[in-house]
Each structure stands twice: as C-alpha cells, then as structure tokens.
Amino acid sequence: PLYEGQPLEGLHLGDFIKNWPPALRAIFIGLSRNFLSAHPQETPLSGFIGFLRFYMLLRRDAWAFSYMPDDGGTSLIEPLVHKLYEKGGATALGCTVTHLRREAEGWRVHWHDTQANQDRSALARQVILAVDASNAEKILRASPETSASAAGLYWPRAMPTAVIRLWFNRTPDADVEAGIFSGECILDNYFWLHRLQNAYIEWHRATGGAAIEVHVYGPPELLQAPDAVLLSRAINDVNGAFPELRNHIIHQVIQHNDPTHTVFGVGPAGQHLEVTTPWPDLFCCGDWVRYPSPALFLERACITSIAAANAVLTAHDLPLWPLLPPPPPERLAGWIQRLMLRGRRARRQRDARR
C-alpha cells in the first residue's frame, strides 16, 4: 500500500479476517494489537499490510529488534538537544504552539508560554511540524491560511497507552529478550530490560534480579481503570507467562501516555499530508506522515524528519543529508513480490482497456 499508494479506503483488518479459522484469526489479532496498537476492527488494512510486508515477509532479519543501549532520553533526545545548542539553536519547554500565520517573509509561529503565562511568537522562513497527527491537525485547523484545507485531510487515529515496569528478585527461566502476549491478556508486548539496557544490566549483575517493561495498548476504556487494577492484572499476566516469578516481585511502576501513538493507515492521495505540504515553506514529519518509505514507527519518524530537514536545506542551496534506502527483499520474497506487482499491473491495464 505504501509503495503503490493504495489506501484501501474504508477497509480494516477485522473485515479481512472475519471468516478465517479461529486459531489463525487469533494470531492476526495478536499481531494487530502488538504492532499497530489497535484491535482488528480499528486497524486500517493498508497499515497492517504495510507492517506485515516490511517487518515480517520480505526479510527474516527484519524480525529482530535493535535496541538503544540506554533510555530514550540518554540515548537519543539529550544528544540531539546538545547538538542543537552546539549549533546555536535553542529549545523552549512548557510552551504550546497554538497556530501559524503566513507573512511576507515566512511563517509566524504563535505559542503560549505556560511558565510565564504569556503568548509569544517568532518568524521563520520555513517551519517543520514535528508533532503527532492530532496536534498537527489542531495547529493547522487553528491557522487562518491552512484551516479550510486541514478540515478535509486524512488524519490517522492516535491511541492512549500505558507502560508498566516490574522488578523481580530473580530472573525468568526462559532466555528471551522480548516477545508478545496473546489471548486473554491485557498486556501486548514485553522487554526484559536487564538484557537490553546498560543501567539494568549493571543492576542485574549486582543483585541477580530482573526487570520487565510491558505495554498496554488499550482499549481506551481499559486504560481508564485504576492503576492498582492495571498493575494487578499486568502482574497476573506476567506470572502466567513466567510462573517461576510468582511471589518474587519487589517493585512496580506505571506510566500513562497521552493519545499520540499512531494507528497507521494510508490515506487517499492529496488528503494524507506528506513531508512537503500544499503550503509553501511548511513541512511535516512523524510516524503518521505519508512517504514512500515502507518503514513505520520510530524509523518512519526519523526518515521523514531527515526528509523534512533536506527540504529546508534545498531551500537554502545546502548539501542534503543522505537517506538510506530500505534493504532489498530476500531472493524468494523478491521473486514473489515481482510476480504480484506484474500481475496487478496487468490487471489494471486490462481494466483500463474495458
């Protein structure tokens, strides 16, 4: 769907699998919840096929995760901010962008500074909206030059989530680093942090303990339950998967996340915002943006960010940052893919002649 620009509009995974055998349907329900954070009836078929194709079918090595050595702040955000300061840039915390206004020399960005309780603005020749879909929609609907068009655009849904971490005074028997839950569980996927992140690895070496991070992707009504209920059910799910850990828990925390987790789908051409928007000098990036790359999630956010930065560099006649192409499919998968593409092209040509 991403390569061919096929939105499969109005179709959801639930429509596709409703008549499948129960066991096979259960597998796809688990995949939908764990990788696109939604139940099949809420998962756009285009997004699911895009995920399945790139992350499971074309290359076996795509099944393996790559992990940051530390938390996201230490590994990614703090180095980026440091580099920004090093280059003369600045950040403003506690501020909410309210709208944009087009002026002769660029875009005036308006925001509310909650710490000073003041409205402020700044003029920029180019602007990149590096925000989630729902906040991009709010900003563009509130901006005079973009509001009319924004009302008719395709905006992917975003879901609230919860992250739970549990600490144990012993390790699980299974030598695994990550996996998914399926069946009658509230949890969706898990990661054993003492096998992945430096701080937890050091703690494990010192204590012999283990720590797991589990994600809860909804439904929204589940996430509204009291924290004590969510923690109790999460511990029960982990104990069910790793019974040797029962009665060995020593600490637990839960974090609720705002509804910014994208349920990706491919919107109709001209209605799904791309990196280059219909408005001059205004660009978008994020995991929800339409772009030819087959990658999703954090990878998509990074790729579209580089593409948006390149658009600004182009406007200033500066060298571009190279974008790495996705790895090619393995031989058998590539052969099947070429056959399918050839067949679809032939079918479209036949339909056009009728």
What are these regions (language model features)?
Residues 1-53:
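Rossmann-like flavin
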Residues 2-4, 63-69, 151-152, 219-225, ...:
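Active-site rim elements
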Residues 6, 10, 25, 69, ...:
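Generic structural signal for well-ordered, non-membrane alpha-helical segments
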Residues 12-16, 31, 75-83, 233-240, ...:
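Amphipathic alpha-helical segments that form well-ordered structural scaffolds
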Residues 51-126:
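Helical element adjacent to the flavin cofactor pocket in flavoenzyme catalytic cores
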Residues 69, 75-82, 96-98, 113, ...:
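Residues forming the flavin
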Residues 93-223, 228, 232, 236-242:
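Mid-domain catalytic core of redox enzymes
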Residues 173-354:
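Conserved flavin/dinucleotide-binding core of flavoenzymes
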